[in-house]
Structure formats: structure tokens, C-alpha cells
Swiss-Prot record:
Mg(2+) binds at D73, D92. It comes from Clostridium tetani (strain Massachusetts / E88). 4-amino-2-methyl-5-(diphosphooxymethyl)pyrimidine binds at Q40, L41, R42, E43, K44, N72, S111, K140. Keywords: Magnesium, Metal-binding, Thiamine biosynthesis, Transferase. It catalyses: 2-[(2R,5Z)-2-carboxy-4-methylthiazol-5(2H)-ylidene]ethyl phosphate + 4-amino-2-methyl-5-(diphosphooxymethyl)pyrimidine + 2 H(+) = thiamine phosphate + CO2 + diphosphate; 2-(2-carboxy-4-methylthiazol-5-yl)ethyl phosphate + 4-amino-2-methyl-5-(diphosphooxymethyl)pyrimidine + 2 H(+) = thiamine phosphate + CO2 + diphosphate; 4-methyl-5-(2-phosphooxyethyl)-thiazole + 4-amino-2-methyl-5-(diphosphooxymethyl)pyrimidine + H(+) = thiamine phosphate + diphosphate. The lineage of its organism: Bacteria, Bacillati, Bacillota, Clostridia, Eubacteriales. Condenses 4-methyl-5-(beta-hydroxyethyl)thiazole monophosphate (THZ-P) and 2-methyl-4-amino-5-hydroxymethyl pyrimidine pyrophosphate (HMP-PP) to form thiamine monophosphate (TMP). Belongs to the thiamine-phosphate synthase family. Pathway: Cofactor biosynthesis; thiamine diphosphate biosynthesis; thiamine phosphate from 4-amino-2-methyl-5-diphosphomethylpyrimidine and 4-methyl-5-(2-phosphoethyl)-thiazole: step 1/1. This is Thiamine-phosphate synthase. The keyword Nucleus does not apply. The gene is thiE.
Length: 209
């Protein structure tokens, strides 16, 4: 672990399908003004060229506000736009290999559902872990679920930041209070709202209460 002073409090994962035609850059800017501390660009059904162009565009916004940009899964895109980091799942390239490719200075996030996965990711050079799905989620139909109990156990087992993901909204975020996690990752709870800035402020408020 390389101390990168990561603020994972409110981690926004993008999904343009939820935006209903709204401009991603504009929505991101509102989210950042509302308290988003970390942005992950996730694009599943676009060409590499399109992903690159979107990432370049988004980087302008994240740079403006000094917010780290994390690219989902695509190490090549992350390097091409000089994003601050990359997030990988258990079925993507192994974390230790990704760490070698991106070097020591970039942020490496890894998804983990079990203590074994979490400890391995930490050994392999992860800077933070995404743990979930904690609650049922529409954005990832095949997401394995992780109990709040397991989330707590993972938090206690590792010494890198833990971000909970999966179905987190203003109605259930307080159930995560006693877990001592470092942040929450959300998609539709922010992107699906008319007032994105307010949605971020409310979530951050609940989480910090």
C-alpha cells in the first residue's frame, strides 16, 4: 500500500444509461460540487476509441476540481489519458500484474467479496477495495451479495480503505454506520436523481452523521 491520502467518502461510478440523455460532464460537475470525492468511469458497450474520447473529456472535469479519475477495467485507457487510477474486478487482469503495468504512483482499486480476496488484493498492491454488493442492485444483475457482517470483517482484516458498493441509497446508508468503512460507492442513487448535487450532499450528510 502506498499512502495516497485517498478520500473515498463518496465514490461515484458512472453509468450513462441512467442519465436519460443528460450530459455526463455536466452531471459529474454537479456531483463533485455536491461532495463526490472520487470518480470511476465505467463504460461497457463502447468502442475503445469512444471510451478514450469520453475518458479524455471527463478528465478535464476531474482535473478542474482535483478529483482522482479511476478507469474501470481498462488499463490501456487509464494510461492513455493519464488517469489517476484503475479499478479491477476478480475476473480482470490480476492485481499484481496491473500494479506492475501502472507503476507505484497510480491508484489501484480491486473488487473483493471475501476476506481471502481482500487480503490477496492488499498483498498484490491494491490501494483500496470495493466490497459488495451490500444491498440488491439493478446496475449489476449478476453481482454477488456481501453481508454487512462480511463487510465489517473485511474492514478489520485489512489496512487499506474499504468502499461499500451495491444498492446503497439514502434509506439504507445508515445501516453501514457501525462498519467503520471509508466510503460508499453509488451509481443510480446519484445519477438517477434530478438534483444530483443535492443527492450527493444528502448521502455525504448521512454518511458523516
Amino acid at each position: 500500500m502506498h499512502n495516497k491520502n485517498l478520500d473515498c467518502t463518496l465514490y461515484l461510478v458512472t453509468d450513462r444509461d441512467i442519465l436519460k440523455g443528460r450530459d455526463l460532464k455536466k452531471v459529474l460537475e454537479e456531483a463533485i460540487l455536491g461532495g463526490t470525492t472520487l470518480v470511476q468511469l465505467r463504460e461497457k458497450n463502447v468502442s475503445s476509441k469512444e471510451f478514450y474520447e469520453i475518458a479524455k473529456d471527463i478528465k478535464v472535469i476531474t482535473d478542474k476540481y482535483n478529483i482522482p479519475l479511476i478507469i474501470n477495467d481498462r488499463v490501456d485507457i487509464a494510461l492513455a489519458v493519464n488517469a489517476e487510477g484503475i479499478h479491477i474486478g476478480q475476473k480482470d487482469l490480476p492485481a499484481n500484474i496491473v500494479r506492475k503495468i501502472i507503476g507505484e504512483d497510480k491508484i489501484l482499486g480491486v473488487s473483493a467479496n471475501t476476506i481471502e480476496d481482500a487480503l490477496k488484493a492488499q498483498r498484490d498492491g491494491a490501494d483500496y477495495l470495493g466490497v459488495g454488493a451490500i444491498f440488491p442492485t439493478n446496475s449489476k444483475k449478476d453481482a454477488e451479495s456481501t453481508s454487512i457482517e462480511t463487510l465489517k470483517e473485511i474492514k478489520n482484516a485489512v489496512n487499506i480503505p474499504i468502499v461499500a458498493i451495491g444498492g446503497i441509497n439514502e434509506n439504507n446508508v445508515q445501516k453501514l454506520k457501525e462498519t467503520n468503512i471509508d466510503g460508499i460507492a453509488v451509481i443510480s442513487t446519484i445519477l438517477g436523481k434530478e438534483d444530483v448535487k443535492k443527492a450527493c450532499e444528502e448521502l455525504t450528510g448521512f454518511f458523516n452523521e
